[in-house]
Every structure is written in C-alpha cells, then in structure tokens.
Amino acid sequence: MWFRNLIPYRLRDQVAYDPETADQRLAALAFTPCGALEPSRSGFVPPLGPGAPLVHAAAGSLLFCLQEETKLLPAAVIREAMDERIGAVEAAEHRKVRKRERDRIRDEVVTDLMPRAFSRHKRTWGYLDTEAGYLVVDAGSEKQAEHFVEQLREAWGDLTLSPPETEMGPGTIMTRWLAQQQLPGDLELGEEAVLEDPNAEGCEVRVKRQDLTSEEMRAHIDAGKRVRRLAVTYSERLSAVIDTDLSLRRLKFHDVIREQAGDRDPESQAEQLDADFSLMTLELRTLIPRLMEWFGGEKAPS
C-alpha cells in the first residue's frame, strides 16, 4: 500500500475525521459489475477487501479505493463481424451498404458482442488527510486522478477541491536549482530530468541515469531550456520526480521508512495495509507542505 505516483488537491473546506459518515456517503457509489450491455462502470470498493467498510481510517486520514470495470471489444473483432454482416447484405440484396447503414450494423455488432466481452479492472487509490487538508491520489495521469475526484465529489456531495498553486513557478525554481547547482538542504539531485524549450512547442530533452550537474545539462540550461520534471531524493527517506504541476512521479519510499512497517509484525494482509498506510500518510503529511515551501509556499485561495 505504497503510492507510486502522487497528485495532490487542496481541500478548501474542513473535512471531519468521521469514517462512519464517509462510509455512508460512499455507499451510494459502491461498485457493482457492468450489466450485460454496459461498456464500463466504476464505483468504490473496500480498501481492506470484501466485507470491510468502504473507508479505511488511520492517523487522521480516510482511505478510498475506486474500481473501474471496462469491457474489452477489440476493434479487429468488431470489424470482422461487421464485414461478415455487410457482405451478407450486399450479396443477398445486390447493392452497396452506405455509411448510415454501416453505422447501424456496427451498433448492432457491439450490442451483440458486449455480453461476451472480457472485462478489465483497474483500481485507483486516494485518501483525504483531514489534518493537513489535502486529497492525495495515486494516479499516473491527470485524467485518471480527475475521474477519481469526480466520483468522490459525486458521492460526498459537498467536497470542494482544487489543485494547489505556489507563489513561485516550480519550473522556474527547478531550472534555477540546475543552473546554480544549489538545492534546498533536504534535497539531493537524482539522475533524471525533462527539459523543454518554452519557445518551441514539443521541443524537449529527456535524460535518465545521467549526472544532472554535467556540462551537457548546463549547456541545455544556457540555451534557454527550462526544467519540467526533475528527479530528487528527499532527506534520504524517499525519491521522486517532481513535475511542474506539483505531482510526484515514480515515488519510492526508502528502506528506512518501509522497515518500520515490518517492525510491527502484522498478522494479516489487512494489518499490513493498515501499517503501511499509517506510515505513508504520516510521511507525506510532512513532505507535501515541504513541497510547497520549495516553491515559495502555497498560494492562499482566491
């Protein structure tokens, strides 16, 4: 239960640490499987597994898990069935099937195949830190995170969230870190970065497993490129790639943190998840405010 990506949202209103009420709210959007003709469906499932509440509470945070089911209908399968039906019509009626009729046949094919389609399931995890005032979503893309937020808002009813903003642009500050080779005292450079040319859309440089203090990197900065993503290590406790949108990618908690969960000697998978979640949220409760401080502090809501 260690998040691998981190997209934070600022809570604009106080949320009470009330697991029972939160569970009741999410019950309205509890996951149920797709119907025979439904292409997709999403809803919340118990983080600790079947039979457990829809909300797991620990250390002032409320953990949620959104499950999505998507029916898989390969385009090649649809095309093959369409061609067969269109061919039968054209052979029987000695005429060409036009676009409108082709579209209708396609819809019929999808309807017929849908009940037999395989399903793919995906889970997205997130938690509300009621003490620090953040929603944290483990998502590899903004689209995935926004879907989680939309579902949580629908279930919650009165949840006001927005992406945090800092006083200074993260891209400007991270570019300065590379240019001056000076970082905050609790940060060390990693070996990965993405630089982009602000005057040429799509022009970017990606480096991995390279010395970011090298002359090559300095030449890119001198040529006017700006940092969009930068790999760092924080206080020798975790490492991540910071994005200019304040998300963290490839988040990795180091052994100094993970070993604390092992020291608790959990007896079940649920106890292990609870231990991991408690440690992770306490660590991120320190990291996220510090992330904002690196870029001049978080802006007050307008």
UniProtKB/Swiss-Prot annotation:
The keyword Cytoplasm applies. Its main location: cytoplasm. GO terms for molecular function: double-stranded DNA binding. GO terms for cellular component: bacterial nucleoid; cytoplasm. Pfam families: RdgC. It is found in: Cytoplasm, Nucleoid. GO terms for biological process: DNA recombination; regulation of DNA recombination. Keywords: Cytoplasm, DNA recombination. PANTHER family: RECOMBINATION-ASSOCIATED PROTEIN RDGC (PTHR38103:SF1). Belongs to the RdgC family. May be involved in recombination. NCBIfam families: PRK00321.1-5 (NF001464). This is Recombination-associated protein RdgC.
